[in-house]
């Protein structure tokens, strides 16, 4: 049989359902692949071999008993190490949580288990999801399977690199300012940020609570849609969860795969027309626009004048919320504890713990956020940023009165060499230039491969109105039907 790691998730689910391959065989093939290549890629922080095989055996037993199986039963999935997994390490890429094993599953993980997917393990990430390259992980960087000397994007580079390395057919990420879509773009995979509130944040280690959004990652648009359908939907344990059904993203992906976009009106954001983007990225984007036009879409230019303020607004809102959220990591209740010698005061222990446990990027953002929220500065910084956020949301609302979806490059540049930007935080922050607006608005966004620049993947971003996730899946699948899924060089 063909190497099982080369199949899509939809194909693997079909093999298992028909009894042409067992879930154990599928799982073992991916575990073997991880053993063979992950010492070079470093996509995983923890591989739960026994747990994965036990879950696979359960699927095989249920099939043998004639029980109905879900659409992804027996399919392996990797989970970004920012979602709690009962009894399995959850570090958020930080030294401060290095030995923490949560006593409960996040809602996303619970739904994955209920659907019969097989969790392979936890993937590497920038510490507390703060970064754009997965170089800020306390456990070392992840490498891009397209070129191991380059970054896989961030913060969820591990989830996307694992897909590109064929270590898993599916993975879960979280997107606060582009942390699913940007890694997807630079690894040639599909990354989806659902509508905020469309996927549960219960059990997600919080970075910026008004922005954090868990979502699916895959190698094909249909696979991402199938995973989206499994993890999405209302959750009473999350106060920000939208009490509405998941849009019919699977049907939309299948419709788009026909390659017909007749009647679809797409908007190119004028303010994103080339600012800060590499020539190769722009060339791939313009070629994708031509392809979408040939598929029947009408492409027009729209203006979103406040998008230029999205990056500075984000870097006030997100650090402000993270400075509050990360206050819980103090060495008192769980995680790392430093200096508890019976002599130091509680305040000294807390300070020593945070000094030793947090990395430089986390400290930078906590300090920035604390300042922005401090007395006398709150209105000038955090308050003003929230007003800008409202203006950006109005830009989206106005734009979506004219078009069905917006398109742009996902990132301004292709994957850069490891270490090339760590000395300049601002250059690192520019990686999310095109993705941040949809986080501030709360609407969905997807990155789908659209071409190559200098032999490296380029992603097209499709943004849609809130709870219209199906629209972006249709457009992305249509482009994929022409461009096709990308295959990196052999490792």
From Swiss-Prot:
Active site, renumbered: 80, 155, 179
Domain of life: Bacteria
Keywords, sorted A to Z: ATP-binding, Ligase, Nucleotide-binding, Protein biosynthesis
InterPro entries: Amidase, Amidase_CS, Amidase_dom, AS_sf, GatA
UniProt KW Transmembrane helix keyword: no
Single GO term (MF): ATP binding
Residues annotated as signal peptide: none
EC number, as in UniProt: 6.3.5.7
Matches recorded under Pfam families: Amidase (PF01425)
Protease in keyword set: no
Any one cellular-component term (Gene Ontology): glutamyl-tRNA(Gln) amidotransferase complex
Any single biological process term in GO: translation
Catalysed reactions, as listed in the record: L-glutamyl-tRNA(Gln) + L-glutamine + ATP + H2O = L-glutaminyl-tRNA(Gln) + L-glutamate + ADP + phosphate + H(+)
Leading EC class: ligase
PANTHER family: GLUTAMYL-TRNA(GLN) AMIDOTRANSFERASE SUBUNIT A, TRANSAMIDASE
Family: Belongs to the amidase family. GatA subfamily.
Subunit note: Heterotrimer of A, B and C subunits.
Known function: Allows the formation of correctly charged Gln-tRNA(Gln) through the transamidation of misacylated Glu-tRNA(Gln) in organisms which lack glutaminyl-tRNA synthetase. The reaction takes place in the presence of glutamine and ATP through an activated gamma-phospho-Glu-tRNA(Gln).
Name the UniProt record assigns to this protein: Glutamyl-tRNA(Gln) amidotransferase subunit A
Species whose genome carries this gene: Salinispora tropica (strain ATCC BAA-916 / DSM 44818 / JCM 13857 / NBRC 105044 / CNB-440)
Gene this protein is translated from: gatA
